[in-house]
Amino acid sequence: MHISFSALPTKIKQLLALCALTIALPAQAQFRVEVTGVGLTQMPIAVATFRGEAQALQKIGAIVKADLERSGVFRSVDTAGAVLDESTRPDLAVWKQKSADSLVTGSVTPLADGRFDVRFRLWDTVRGQDLGGQNYAVTAGDLRLSAHRIADFVYEKLTGEKGIFSTRIAYVTKAGQRHTLWVADADGENAQSALASPEPIISPAWSPSGSQLAYVSFESRKPVIYSHDVASGKRKLIANFRGSNSAPAWSNDGRQIVATLSREGGSQLYVMDAGGGEPRRLTQSSSIDTEPAFSADGKTIFFVSDRGGAPQIYRMSAAGGNAERVTFNGNYNISPALSPDGKYMAYISRVGGAFKLQLMDLAGGTSAQITDTSADESPSFAPNSRLIVYATQQQGREALMTTTLDGKIKARLAGASGDIREPDWGPFSR
């Protein structure tokens, strides 16, 4: 590929040059959510402090509030520390006067077996209606998950669309010679190490069921593709053919994996059973074809190729065949990610000397830049298609960010220090 490798973002250096990672692990795998920006049509909502939450290890109300703010759909109304449980009907007129269209109340109660009873209720202050609620009996370790589920309930009730707060993200890091694959909540908290290795780990990709993660490991001194069972920690070898094995992408039904293999010389796209087996070649070019991504209907594969002289995004039938160029603005476009609703493609474009996150309307073919940072990488859509997670540099630090599709609301999932790379947003699964 005719590119200056010194100018490439980290992910493409890994995929095309198959070099060692050069990023640093955060001092700790905990994140702080920082939300910036204001949307034009945000819904004002008040989330009260849950009665009894001081007895728990998590502030349920604060987590629900942060989730809703990060979505870009809601604007929080100050509750002035009000503590309200779900069992008593609040004075909704007071909250309407505070400009809150909705109100969330709840409680957290310790149980005799060590678990916690978490209850909540959602109120419509404008119509004076009880919009319902739920209750969960959870362990201390699942208190955050219960808060995310509350936020999911609120989001779906008020927007008519499924919430994504109880979903998960995966990403990779490096500290010294230690490379780690992490799985975390959608807000970046509760990070758990899925795999650690002295050799690089790259390209994590969630299966459609959310039970598996495909990734590329260099532990055998060459890039090899594995599938990792998230619940059990067991893994299965998927592709270890001659040459490199990289950039795995799951088919929409989870039965197949498309990847870039160089078993016949050049780097081309191949499809194989998700459990491994003999691959079938999909592309027949003399160029580098990499970074495959399936369309929402599973009928089309988008990928990056330099067959036109510079890296651009193409698409072809999932069965293979002739490829059609998709990106035309600029001479460097990589990392396609398709929205689950089939409407958009996120990708990275080189603009001058910067790498910018772009969003393309697939129906019209028009693109818009939606970030103001200069080293964006690895976009991935939330399963409801309303947010994008990506890696970038901000204020001299590597970080994960989420953004709304219009770029107006961004949330930084920032560690204390160091680098975080290659996020992939998991499906609705829990």
Where is each model-derived feature located?
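Short beta-strand->alpha-helix linker/helix-N-cap micro-motif
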Residues: 35-94, 104, 108-109
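Residue-level detector of Asp-centered blade-edge/turn motifs that repeat once per structural unit
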Residues: 163-165, 208-209, 252-253, 296-297, ...
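Short loop/turn segments that connect beta-strands within beta-propeller blades
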Residues: 126, 185-189, 229-233, 273-277, ...
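Blade-level signature of beta-propeller repeat domains, shared across WD40, Kelch, NHL, RCC1
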Residues: 398-430
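A flexible loop/linker signature enriched in serine peptidases of the S9 family
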Residues: 162, 173-180, 196-199, 216-225, ...
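Amphipathic beta-strand/beta-sheet edge segments enriched in Tyr/Trp
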Residues: 31, 88-153
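Hydrophobic beta-strand positions that form the internal "hydrophobic ladder"
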Residues: 169, 213, 254-258, 298-301, ...
